[in-house]
Amino acid sequence: MSLDVRTITPSESAEWMRAVSTGFLTAGTPSEELVADRFAGADLSRTQGAFEAGRCVATFRSFAQELTVVGGATVAADAISGVTVTPTHRRRGLLSRMMATDLAAAKERGEPVASLIAAEYPIYGRYGFGPAAWTSVWEVSVYRAGLDARRSGQPADGGRIEMVDGADVRKLGPEVHGALAARQPGVVTRDERWWRQRTGAAPSSAHEKWTEPFYVVHRAADGTVDGLMTYGTDDTWGDAKQPLNTASVRDMIALNPAAERALWHYLCSIDWITTIRSGYRAPDDLLPLLLPDPRAARMITNADWLWLRMLDVPRALEARTYGTEASLVLEVRDDAGLAGGRFLLDASTGGARCVSTTRSADLVLGVAELATLYLGDESVRRLVDLGRAEESRAGAATTADAVFRTGRRPWCPDVF
């Protein structure tokens, strides 16, 4: 039976969502409310499906996104999501066909990069994607943290913690997140639907059961909101009637270390909470060092997270700033023919110029490896040692590391 791979029509949105749910191991039919919310304002020209006898057996969509790069500028990204293939139709090239169509369209639109969160590591490298930012989850033993159990939940520097509700977060959150996005490489845009969904004002995905969380904000001494946290708790008691409750952070953004410290210390101060799970944080997050005993924080997850794919090398490299002034000739290899070439990068702390060149290459690397370097998280020397990049000029890897690396690691707090 033939397979029809194409963009979907409005009447097929519910069937497409059913296939997505199947791919994410959630049985059943999505509600009409969820389908309507998911497709409100959606660009169906960027929503693909594979159909067999009217049944959707593979899904793929993309949407417009802004990605913060090193230096605080943003680039337009082709954000890819909802990628599934029904188990009965694996290994038929369906993802490859949909990916090729989408990336070609993104390049035609002029988007310098594509982005995604990879559910599985081995899938996306063959399409030119590389892991550009990692994520970590920390588990904190409150009893071992070394904080004074008699303290209040309020900071001592004139700031204060306030409990708020979802409506407050929808009003205050976008400004705080926007300020974070202006400085943190790896942050991606959050639209209105994101805030509505994470505060219960819009239906959650079929595989995400909604429970109302707690919301708090941190106000600086002048009253400015410079941090917010969303968290849930369980209800667990030991045999001796001792509380063994865990607070699990769903979202936490802070614009300075004082706000970050105040929010974590507040969470540690709540009666009955004995364990904290941090949610997705940067691997070099300050959390352990904000506790008197950093060993109370144990990293329980450290994994690749945000994957990028270069579509326009000069535009992407010119968008970010660099650690030092240097010139490098990069030969970028791309089997898909979308972004390969030889490029001269004149980098500086204030920006860069990147153009095609015929000069001899200093470094030879794949398009996926360049994506891995783009936000400053990976070492060129490591890639050379692994055989994933070639140093054509002695010392080029050391120079490239000085150019690309950053003092703090990139971080993408979101799933999309």
Swiss-Prot record:
Protein keywords: Acyltransferase, Transferase
A family per Pfam: Acetyltransf_9
Span of domain N-acetyltransferase: 3-150
Active site: 124, 416
Binding sites annotated in the UniProt record for acetyl-CoA: 83-85, 91-96
Gene3D superfamilies cross-referenced by the UniProt entry: 3.40.630.30, SCP2 sterol-binding domain
Acyltransferase recorded as keyword: yes
Documented EC number(s): 2.3.1.-
Keyword presence, Acyltransferase: yes
Molecular function, one GO term: aminoglycoside N-acetyltransferase activity
Record-level GO BP terms: aminoglycoside antibiotic catabolic process
Family to which this protein belongs: Belongs to the acetyltransferase Eis family.
Oligomeric and partner information: Homohexamer; trimer of dimers.
Protein name: Uncharacterized N-acetyltransferase SGR_3976
Originating species: Streptomyces griseus subsp. griseus (strain JCM 4626 / CBS 651.72 / NBRC 13350 / KCC S-0626 / ISP 5235)
